[in-house]
Amino acid sequence: MSQEDKGFPAEVVEIIGRTGVAGEVIQVRAKILAGRDKGRVLTRNVKGPVRVGDILILRETEIEARKLKPR
């Protein structure tokens, strides 16, 4: 299996806010730790409990989440 088949580790560096109809999704900034985009910081949506320092396994590193709009 290649690295692309397993996923890419990313560390949560900042929690931006909550989104979704009931606030069930958390938007975070995550730094890619390995692979082609190592060192790049992405904005991603995460479902479930998460805190700064957690490691996420991302299937891909191309797509970023849309920015949260202030209300």
UniProtKB/Swiss-Prot annotation:
It comes from Korarchaeum cryptofilum (strain OPF8). Coiled coil: none annotated. Belongs to the eukaryotic ribosomal protein eS28 family. The keyword Transferase does not apply. This is Small ribosomal subunit protein eS28. GO terms for cellular component: cytosolic small ribosomal subunit. SUPFAM superfamilies: Nucleic acid-binding proteins. The lineage of its organism: Archaea, Thermoproteota, Candidatus Korarchaeia, Candidatus Korarchaeales, Candidatus Korarchaeaceae. Keywords: Ribonucleoprotein, Ribosomal protein. The gene is rps28e.
